[in-house]
Amino acid sequence: MEKKKNNPIYLGFASQKGGVGKSSLAEVLASILYYEKNISLAVVDCDGTQESFYKLRERDRDLIESSPELGKELHERLSRYGKKSYHIIRSKPERAVSDVMKYFRKMKTAPQLIIFDFPGHALTSAMMDLSITMDYIISPIEADPQSLASSFAYARTIRDLGIGFEGSRIQDFFLLWNKINRSASTTVIDLFSQNAREQGLPIFDTRIYNSVRFSRELAQGGVKGVFRCSYLPPAMALRPQTGVDEWVREVMEKLNLKTEDSV
């Protein structure tokens, strides 16, 4: 589907279980797409009490303000990208879309992509209402049969609502294997991947592998060794063997995202 310039893609990150890395993946994706791939975007943090995006930006900002040297180094790095940091809208599920509309009215041109970080448990009436306003939803899953059952149920519900509800925007729902242990058996993963395909539930080909690198913020890695940061993409040296770059390419392909100079 060809995207209209003033009709942004709404991408939601949702999960049925806390701790699956939903927000970390959304943060990494946003930074790579915005700073490296030159895709205009904004983030809506409606993750309840967690507010992962908002609090990450706060930690980044506080650290920069307390360290002039780090602030100077970060400013020099940002100048290479030729842009300011992406905007984060602090919101709640029931007013997330209206808050986005207010943001649009302040903009000359709407961004290409809006990323919504959902609360950790999506089966509430407010979350179901928000889910069907998305164009796409990405739901990270882990190799745990109990949590997989609830994740699959949510995916089926959204798929069926998207088909049967006239006001739905939903185009596709993607499951994503996350925190995969390279040394562990893939029996559960292979079994549930096949089960997802049989149920008609799309699943990314890419798998994201478990790594302590995902926890490296600006305070631990500095500008040259950071992985999670709202002002910078993950350091290139930290990405091999994580699956992140392969996944970002797959996201761009599935969502038909274009770099700004090719839009």
Where are these regions (language model features)?
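Beta-strand-loop-alpha "switch" segments that mediate conformational coupling across diverse proteins
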Residues: 179-229
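Inter-motif core of Ras-like GTPase G domains
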Residues: 125-145
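NTP-binding/hydrolysis catalytic cores, primarily Walker-type P-loop NTPases
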Residues: 226-263
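Extreme N-terminal, non-catalytic leader segments
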Residues: 1-15
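P-loop/Walker-type NTP enzyme "switch/lid" segment
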Residues: 14-20, 34-114
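Conserved C-terminal guanine-recognition region of P-loop GTPase G domains, centered on the G4
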Residues: 151-167
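Gly/Ala-rich phosphate-binding loop of Rossmann-like dinucleotide-binding domains
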Residues: 30, 34-35, 131
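Hydrophobic positions on the alpha1 helix immediately C-terminal to the Walker A/P-loop
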Residues: 24-25, 29
